[in-house]
Amino acid sequence: MFESRPDRDAEVVLIGRSNVGKSTLMREITGHTFDTGQRPGVTRSPNHFDWASADFVISDLPGFGFMKGVPEDVREEIKTDVVQYVERNAEHILVGILVVDGKSVIDIIDRHSGPDEIPHDVEMFHFLREVGVEPVVAVNKMDKVDDKDARLNELCDRLGLHPPWQQWQETIAPISAKHGSTEPLNEAVRHHLHEVQRDDLFQFF
């Protein structure tokens, strides 16, 4: 269980599988470099970044899902910790940024879809909605995707959102964190902050 959360009223969280670029995105949003492990699963506790002048924190939660060299029971424990963290702090979390790898997300979802299996990304998207946290899917590494519209439409379909993706721009945000191309995500987050009358937090996005 994660115990390190700063005492801040408002929060935005980054959630996602290992190796989807969460740490790069966190650095892009905050301008701050975090100590991240070279191997997936090394980061087992959240990275929090808060500003002294604002009652606000951004949290990068540990990556879940398959991690090479990490036992399955440890992977499940990390995922459980992430879920419990969100449940425990849901009333403070204004937006849940679900980061996925635009290049591989469809293959991963399809590989793990079956009668007895729900893909982690799909499960986490609906979980955020169930606990009252607005999800924004940051579809990262889109600079590596050729047919962007087709890929984003497929992702909408897998998440139960009726394509075309352009009608879901408050929920689906194609980005490339490595290249600093995050404006669609910033706009989506600002939309949800405005909905809860927190325009004062626009300065961070």
From Swiss-Prot:
InterPro entries: G_ENGB_dom (IPR030393), GTP-bd (IPR006073), GTP-bd_ribosome_bio_YsxC (IPR019987), P-loop_NTPase (IPR027417), Small_GTP-bd (IPR005225)
Pfam family, one: MMR_HSR1
Domain (EngB-type G) ranges: 8-195
Keyword field contains rRNA-binding: no
Keywords, alphabetical: Cell cycle, Cell division, GTP-binding, Magnesium, Metal-binding, Nucleotide-binding, Septation
Gene Ontology terms: biological process: cell division
SUPFAM superfamilies: P-loop containing nucleoside triphosphate hydrolases
Annotated residues for binding of Mg(2+): S23, T43
Cofactors named for this entry: Mg(2+)
Organism domain of life: Archaea
List of residues binding GTP: 16-23, 41-45, 60-63, 140-143, 175-177
GO MF, one example: GTP binding
Function field: Necessary for normal cell division and for the maintenance of normal septation.
Family: Belongs to the TRAFAC class TrmE-Era-EngA-EngB-Septin-like GTPase superfamily. EngB GTPase family.
Name of this chain's protein: Probable GTP-binding protein EngB
